[in-house]
Amino acid sequence: MMKNMILPIAFTALIASMTACSDETDPILTQKDWDGTATYFQSSDEHGFSMYYKPQVGFVGDPMPFYDPVAKDFKVMYLQDYRPNPEATYHPIFGVATKDGATYESLGELISCGGRDEQDAAIGTGGTIYNPADKLYYTFYTGNKFKPSSDQNAQVVMVATSPDFKTWTKNRTFYLKGDTYGYDKNDFRDPFLFQTEDGVYHMLIATRKNGKGHIVEFT
């Protein structure tokens, strides 16, 4: 059983005022010679993006970066946004691999949307870890129910596993629900995972309780 801790979100506002003046003595800005002063990558992708990855069709939503200790590269999962998206089933998880942040290899669709009546009809943001004990990748993600009834959860944290980061299998018995722990059943999303030096895995989830935003930690 996972243990949870309540971490209320503290919102802090910082107000700064600035004044500006100008006269004829202001320095004249000149165009920088970036070719002579900077080193940068030239993308080799056939579709020709220069810095930010964009799929050939649609757009990238909510990038979920993960360093792959097996392949020794970075995997960036993202929500594939077609615009327009289907009414009920949208935002499957796609991915790319990169070693330098400029040259990308498309991994295609990794985790598909569920059926119209399933909990993950629409997929929301998640996070990934690699467990060397069983040599599996675990991606925890948000399952968004299409038109949930009053007794159903609009958002649930779900999980899929893969031995090679290519073929993913959803665990249809794992459903982490906010109301099980006293939190909102409709706002329970965006799991973020990390491992501390003691080897313990942690998962942070954004949710609400009594009308206030919370970050919940599971270990």
Predicted regions and their residues:
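Hydrophobic helical h-region of N-terminal Sec-dependent signal peptides
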Residues: 7-15
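Bacterial N-terminal signal peptides that target proteins for export
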Residues: 1-7
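C-terminal motif of bacterial Sec signal peptides marking the signal peptidase cleavage site
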Residues: 17-20
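Beta-rich carbohydrate-recognition and catalytic domains
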Residues: 22-190, 194-219
